């Protein structure tokens, strides 16, 4: 099975979501080495954080390739990545930090998303309307 991950937190966050994301990838690749793990991140981030991912033949990092995608990495993560995943014949996408790219379902790519915080549901008054609409 070819499993793709949103790896931005792996390469950009030293604690919290970064630790969780690295733990998931390292644990899965150690326990199920027969699968392929593709880590998609908008930039190389911090080398020290990338090195916390165990070197295994089944794990690889992937970055935006096109000029437009490199100029607008946030847009690539939300919409451009879907075309890449389709071309790569990914079997499953895992959004490790509360979000997944648009149009995965329409492109036949099953997805899992980890939700870390639901406080916006309990205390919506603490959030701006735009943030509430994004989170829900």
Residue map of PLM features:
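Carbohydrate transferase catalytic cores enriched for Leloir-type hexosyltransferases
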Residues: 1-136
């Amino acid at each position: 099975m070819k499993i793709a991950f949103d790896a931005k937190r792996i390469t950009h966050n030293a604690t919290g979501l970064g630790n969780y994301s690295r733990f998931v990838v390292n644990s899965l690749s150690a326990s199920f080495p027969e699968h392929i793990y593709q880590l998609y991140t908008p930039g190389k981030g911090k080398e020290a954080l990338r090195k916390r991912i165990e070197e295994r033949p089944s794990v690889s990092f992937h970055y935006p390739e096109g000029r437009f995608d490199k100029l607008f990495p946030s847009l690539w993560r939300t919409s451009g990545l879907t075309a890449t995943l389709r071309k790569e014949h990914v079997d499953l996408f895992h959004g490790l930090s509360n979000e997944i790219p648009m149009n995965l379902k329409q492109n036949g790519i099953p997805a899992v998303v980890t939700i870390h915080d639901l406080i916006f549901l309990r205390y919506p008054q603490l959030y701006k309307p735009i943030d509430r609409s994004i989170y829900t």
